[in-house]
């Protein structure tokens, strides 16, 4: 596997996110101290990536900063807003905020014969993909609850 150092370090946080998801399901609590190191690491990796794009000489350099802006200035505040409005739990919002800092763009991993991710999205903002998938899932659950209420099932 070939990847940039920041993208490899981003893989290292997956067990922490998995543990937090498991703990959220089992105990319904994830300590707030869980998210501080993730956001700190994400900020360092973001600076590392940004330094490589500061020249704005490659076509993707400006796009990188647009994607980071969408992740940090749109996705993270929406996660916070959903939490304040009761649409997300605290751990859900903090996880999405941490993801918006850790993974503002899709990481790329090169293997022998193929590259991940396989599908290239139009927007290219990983945290936006996580947010939209979450909203679709919650919308489906709400719609199912509505149907059960209407039909008495």
Give short role names for the model-derived ranges.
Residues 1-153:
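A membrane-topology feature that recognizes alpha-helical transmembrane segments
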């Amino acid at each position: 596997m070939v990847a940039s150092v920041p993208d490899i370090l981003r893989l290292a946080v997956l067990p922490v996110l998995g543990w937090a998801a498991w703990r959220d399901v089992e105990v319904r609590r994830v300590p707030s101290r869980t998210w501080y190191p993730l956001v700190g690491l994400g900020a360092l990796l973001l600076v590392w990536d940004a330094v490589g794009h500061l020249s704005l000489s490659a076509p993707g350099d400006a796009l990188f900063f647009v994607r980071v802006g969408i992740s940090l200035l749109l996705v993270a505040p929406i996660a916070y807003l959903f939490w304040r409005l009761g649409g997300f739990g605290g751990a859900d919002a903090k996880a999405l905020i941490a993801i918006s800092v850790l993974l503002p763009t899709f990481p790329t991993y090169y293997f022998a014969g193929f590259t991940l991710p396989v599908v290239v999205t139009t927007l290219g903002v990983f945290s936006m993909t996580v947010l939209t998938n979450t909203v679709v899932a919650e919308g489906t659950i709400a719609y199912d609850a509505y149907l059960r209420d209407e039909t008495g099932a």
